[in-house]
Amino acid sequence: MRAKGKLGTWILIVSLFWGGGSAPAADTLRDIRVLSQDARAYITPEGAEQMRNAAREQDRQDARYNEQFFAPWRQTQPRHGVEEIVRAFRRCLNRPGYADNGRRHAPEWIEGLQASAQFETYPNARYAGMTTRRTDVRILPTKQPRYADGNTSPFDLLQETLLPVNTPVFVVHETRDKAWLLVETAWTVGWLPAEDVARVDETLIRSWESGPYVTVIRDRVPVYGVEGGAFLFDASVGAMFPLAKVREDGWEILVTVPDRGRRGVVLTAFADRAAVERKPLPLTPENVAGQINTLIGGPYGWGGMHGNRDCSATLRDLFAPFGIWLPRNSMEQARQGGGVINLKRLDAGAREAQIASRGVPFLSLLWEPGHIMLYLGRMHGEICVFHNFWSVKARDRKGRVRKKVIIGRAAITTLHPGREFQKKGLRTSDRLRELWAMTLLPPAL
């Protein structure tokens, strides 16, 4: 009986630990429970008409997308000077941060990385390349993380972004041991493991630039070699490839793989029909909503950590299949095109009126410093947005965090997520009041 009592006590402790003692689940956020998480529910006849008008501009935008995508292959010199690259090392040297074991990095660690970068020879590479797998762009040439603190921060501050497989790059510089390459793409700059990049020649470049193209519309799509059927890599939403042949069961596409000397070789590969479409995917409300639904629930990943997406990567990948080019950074996305509407100096009511009267559902970005969202329209009288975000915090009158709900995924919410926690003197951030700008994407101008 005594043993049974101990077992019962143990079960109770475990249940409290995993149940009542744990952080609230993402679906405890009222917006996510109440609002439809099916983007098709936000399509209206008026919004559909606005998008049909915008679709007339799509071919021009798609041509611009392709031009930007391949731009690194036409570079002969780096766009970023050595001082700009060295500045990242200096910032980290002043604040080395913490390692994944919770201990503070030694300044000597940063100094060693800078010495290995041999900046006295910058730029020592200067050639065209292509990624041969999905790969992380790092701010410093290391896979070791740098956290803001040793206990609670889940974000690696050395993570810049994630590059899809078969992304054109301009290789600017290499470390002394040749293990890391500093590369530029049309939307980022940073360090890649040399094993993830192949050098490409003019013949390969021509085979890629000639088109036509297909675009991936699902995540983690396996790609196989046509000869032998070997698995080559997986590709995710927004990746693009030259089309070789249409088959009843799928698509034959051209892909780049490395040879033993890490030079790029073009192979014919195969991808499933349901996961790939011709690029650009027609710009219709149904297609945009379908792509949102593909991304809904996708885990949040700071800078693309673990192959996931943050707010700006989510929107960039959402619009890539449609041939609509977006930069990688949320601030740069907000400056995209010429349709930027300043909301900063307006009160909350005037901001809401501007969004309702001038916003084009599914083609308007709402930006606040550090975060970006897609305007979907209204439901239950409220402005609704699609975005990927980490958490909602409730603070007391002194600004101290008293409640934090981890969302950590892409979802549809109002501009007031978490307002149900605004009680007993607590307040949550009001995204409507924090908005600085609304941007109409180029097709909607």
PLM regions and their residue ranges:
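Bacterial N-terminal signal peptides
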Residues: W10-G19
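...with weaker cross-activation on analogous glycine-rich loops/strands in unrelated enzymes
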Residues: L162, P327-D396
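Short, structured beta-strand/loop micro-motifs enriched in basic residues and often containing a Trp
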Residues: T132-P154, Y213-E227, N342-R351
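Boundary regions of SH3-family modules and the immediately adjacent low-complexity/disordered segments
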Residues: A26-T135, P154, E184-R218, D249-A289
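Active-site nucleophilic cysteine motif
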Residues: I292, W302-Q333
